Amino acid sequence: MEPLEFHSGKVCPLNRANVDTDQIIPKQFLKRIERTGFGQFLFFHWRFNDDGTERSDFVLNDPDYKGSSILVAGDNFGCGSSREHAPWALADYGFKVIIAPDFADIFYNNALKNGILVIKMDEQQVKSWMQKAVDGLTLDVDLKQQTIQASDGTITSFDITPYQREKLINGWDDIALTLLKEEKIAAYESAN
């Protein structure tokens, strides 16, 4: 997992509440176990027509939002069935940060475990950023300071547990954390 201490990116507004994991990555694309290659299927039924052409009315197909790396979404993002493929698809597409008023618990934890910074933010602030995204809003997200500075100069703070913050800043996934204790594990195993 790549360390994430600071990220500056363009905002893509997804003004929808209750976006579930099947909408994020439909079930027909879950047959693979590698973590890469899922970005092309992100929001598949919203992004593409039945004939495979892009739908011009979906935000990810809008040229103004190409290259966005911060997704600002509606309430209860990531609800529905538990599937780790959802954060894989978001990360593979290029999203590093997702901001919403609330997240489904399992999605929230899966996203953090896969290196995506998920930030719970006041609904009024989320709506404000969605509106400003039309004018090319960028956000500077400082995980160390736990602040977000918008391109209009406003600064907002956010909360994250110290444990999750340290994991993201250092790029530690669960395996990396286990390997940090390799000597203690080996000592325990040799003693028992």
Curated annotation (Swiss-Prot):
<keyword id="KW-0432">Leucine biosynthesis</keyword>
<protein>
    <recommendedName>
        <fullName>3-isopropylmalate dehydratase small subunit</fullName>
        <ecNumber>4.2.1.33</ecNumber>
    </recommendedName>
</protein>
<keyword id="KW-0100">Branched-chain amino acid biosynthesis</keyword>
<dbReference type="GO" id="GO:0003861">
    <property type="term" value="F:3-isopropylmalate dehydratase activity"/>
</dbReference>
<dbReference type="InterPro" id="IPR000573">
    <property type="entry name" value="AconitaseA/IPMdHydase_ssu_swvl"/>
</dbReference>
<keyword id="KW-0456">Lyase</keyword>
<comment type="similarity">
    <text>Belongs to the LeuD family. LeuD type 1 subfamily.</text>
</comment>
<dbReference type="GO" id="GO:0009316">
    <property type="term" value="C:3-isopropylmalate dehydratase complex"/>
</dbReference>
<dbReference type="Pfam" id="PF00694">
    <property type="entry name" value="Aconitase_C"/>
</dbReference>
<keyword id="KW-0028">Amino-acid biosynthesis</keyword>
<dbReference type="InterPro" id="IPR050075">
    <property type="entry name" value="LeuD"/>
</dbReference>
<dbReference type="GO" id="GO:0009098">
    <property type="term" value="P:L-leucine biosynthetic process"/>
</dbReference>
<dbReference type="InterPro" id="IPR004431">
    <property type="entry name" value="3-IsopropMal_deHydase_ssu"/>
</dbReference>
<comment type="pathway">
    <text>Amino-acid biosynthesis; L-leucine biosynthesis; L-leucine from 3-methyl-2-oxobutanoate: step 2/4.</text>
</comment>
<comment type="subunit">
    <text>Heterodimer of LeuC and LeuD.</text>
</comment>
<comment type="function">
    <text>Catalyzes the isomerization between 2-isopropylmalate and 3-isopropylmalate, via the formation of 2-isopropylmaleate.</text>
</comment>
<dbReference type="InterPro" id="IPR033940">
    <property type="entry name" value="IPMI_Swivel"/>
</dbReference>
<dbReference type="InterPro" id="IPR015928">
    <property type="entry name" value="Aconitase/3IPM_dehydase_swvl"/>
</dbReference>
